[in-house]
């Protein structure tokens, strides 16, 4: 007798799904709530899927292998495709009605979502999961693509493994080693800076699925021992389950890692917590499984697929319709927008579960249509509802077609960045040794500017205001790149009198990096640190660190881009980060004020040397 109950219904899995989708919802809809790594909910889903699907496939059957494979794929299609088709067409149609940035790349997204290859299609298209320059209406289906690729390949590989590795411990060892290899590959990719590739890749993000597989192998045909039903075993199992939930929560509360520095550690922590929770739930006589499967959590868990499927597109649409940008930061989602999205996602998922997913899953598509046809003949209300649904379906298909046809080639943020790149490419100014300082005038030939995509978007305005300035700006550049760039310019004699640095948009700033840049600039030049403005949760810390450093270091001032642009968000692109032409002029004004402040500070200390760090 197996230790676990019938694979058709494992205790605790619905509750675990509810916890997983809850973490993802908080992470996306309420990013200021402190669940900075709520994306680990996806890894909980992966572990549950790996365990559940493998357990189902290991169940004894009298049917042939080919029949079982086809039956498995048919049931997966019934479960996933109807809701996905409705979500894609409805959301694409609404996006067409809204227009603008939300339509960018929608054809590619629909292709990836409908073929369950979204993760690879997105990578081929240069998508950056951790950037905010492109909304990507269906970005969340990348994880569904990973799972579907698993559903396609695993039924083909499992029979071969069962023949080659017959012993249970060999199967468990194989799955654990494969999971370790996947996690190692993610760490390698993250180390190379390919964070989105590491996160999206089926090969590099398969460790959760593989750990779930390992647990399914371990519990296969496990004998039911008397001690498993003892009070001590039940209490111990409950403690193990709570430890698992605790590990998941701890992982979700880890600080955000914009550069992926927490990968794969944080994701592995949540995966191990999921393993412990599943194990505690499926043990005979377990209290934990029943405790986690309380009715509210079970209700959410049953509908977790639909809630997850709908929540992100709805969030993008709500923010687009209300003129807000889409970002992963704490300021990126107004609380009201988060609640509106949550209510819509839960209501739509509940209706979809009852009216669409459950009938198709139980009866199949053809039998469901026959049942509707039979009621259509007898019931006027059914006739009205059916005709309304047909009209809505036609409108959704038409709207989806229009969305693809009318999608703009790039977002407003990408357009501003492209303009900056063209300005850099066409500039005539060349880096040259800085001239002797002039008393008060700001000459572009005295300026070296190093920055990220915000400075890049402002490059045309900088060249207009400071002809001859040298600007070195690049998309996704972090503060860690600053010292190397400044050091190279100084070594070549090309570092000018006024050094302007704007590198706070893409992650936190370490005071050691600021110290190194200031040392390289030296006591005879001015260092202007431009603070940051973006709907990202690390921005307040960045700006505070810049201000604190400038307050104790001579020759360093802060240019307040945040304060200058905050009242003029309408001058930013749709992502609420990158300035357009008018916003770029404000950026240039901020830089000019910063340089004048640095000149005034230098004039007040004609013979002073740099002060030591005071903290």
Regions found by a protein language model. Give the residues of each.
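Hydrophobic membrane-embedded alpha-helices
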Residues: 2-3, 9-13, 19-402
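Short amphipathic alpha-helical segments and helix-helix/interface helices
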Residues: 13, 237, 459, 514-519, ...
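Active-site flanking residues adjacent to catalytic metal/cofactor-binding acidic residues
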Residues: 42, 451, 501, 559
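Short hydrophobic segments within beta-strands
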Residues: 47, 450-451, 502, 530
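Extracellular/periplasmic envelope-modification machinery, especially enzymes
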Residues: 254-257, 322-336, 343-347, 354, ...
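Structural motif
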Residues: 497-500, 526
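Active-site segments of SGNH/GDSL-like serine hydrolases
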Residues: 517-544
